[in-house]
């Protein structure tokens, strides 16, 4: 199952961007034997400001995918439950899993309503760059849990 972290905005050479890329690479390497991956980060930018314009550039990337939108009102899952959910999606035959991270103002309601589900990293608000790194780390952690690796400790 291919996993895409689809994000609005480009982080360039920020340390958080490099951290996210590192975790995505680790998840890709660790997930091969589990039929999970590759894990990629795709950055998109709208030509006009606003959530509606961002929705237009996100929409083409969502076709045929199981979509989980990161949103402050989403479901909070502990790491092990998150891993089990990713494993279930794979086992149910989903070929593509896309996680969405919106811009500074979040995701357009039209995108949120088309997502299969929403995910939150707790009740706090996180900077975009940190949310991306945290999501990439959680995907890596999920892969290691599915693999039975000692990376995650309960």
Curated annotation (Swiss-Prot):
Keywords: Cytoplasm, Methyltransferase, rRNA processing, S-adenosyl-L-methionine, Transferase. GO terms for cellular component: cytoplasm. NCBIfam families: PRK00103.2-2 (NF000988). Specifically methylates the pseudouridine at position 1915 (m3Psi1915) in 23S rRNA. This is Ribosomal RNA large subunit methyltransferase H. S-adenosyl-L-methionine binds at residue 102. It catalyses: pseudouridine(1915) in 23S rRNA + S-adenosyl-L-methionine = N(3)-methylpseudouridine(1915) in 23S rRNA + S-adenosyl-L-homocysteine + H(+). It holds the Pfam family SPOUT_MTase. Its EC number is 2.1.1.177. One of its GO terms (molecular function) is rRNA (pseudouridine-N3-)-methyltransferase activity. HAMAP family: 23SrRNA_methyltr_H. It is found in: Cytoplasm. Homodimer. Its main location: cytoplasm. Belongs to the RNA methyltransferase RlmH family. The keyword Methyltransferase applies. InterPro entries: Alpha/beta_knot_MTases, RlmH-like, tRNA_m1G_MTases_N. It is an enzyme of class 2 (transferase). The keyword Protease does not apply.
């Amino acid at each position: 199952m291919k996993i895409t972290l689809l994000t609005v905005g480009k982080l360039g050479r920020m340390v958080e961007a490099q951290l996210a890329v590192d975790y995505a690479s680790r998840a890709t390497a660790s997930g091969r034997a589990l039929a999970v991956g590759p894990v990629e980060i795709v950055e998109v930018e709208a030509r006009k400001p606003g959530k509606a314009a961002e929705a237009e550039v996100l929409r083409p990337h969502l076709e045929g995918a199981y979509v989980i939108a990161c949103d402050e009102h989403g479901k909070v899952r502990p790491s092990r439950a998150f891993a089990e959910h990713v494993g279930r999606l794979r086992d149910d035959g989903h070929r593509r899993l896309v996680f969405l991270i919106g811009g500074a103002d979040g995701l357009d309601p039209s995108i949120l309503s088309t997502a299969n589900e929403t995910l939150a990293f707790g009740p706090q608000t996180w900077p975009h760059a940190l949310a991306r790194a945290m999501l990439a780390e959680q995907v890596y952690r999920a892969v290691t849990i599915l693999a039975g690796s000692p990376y995650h400790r309960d």
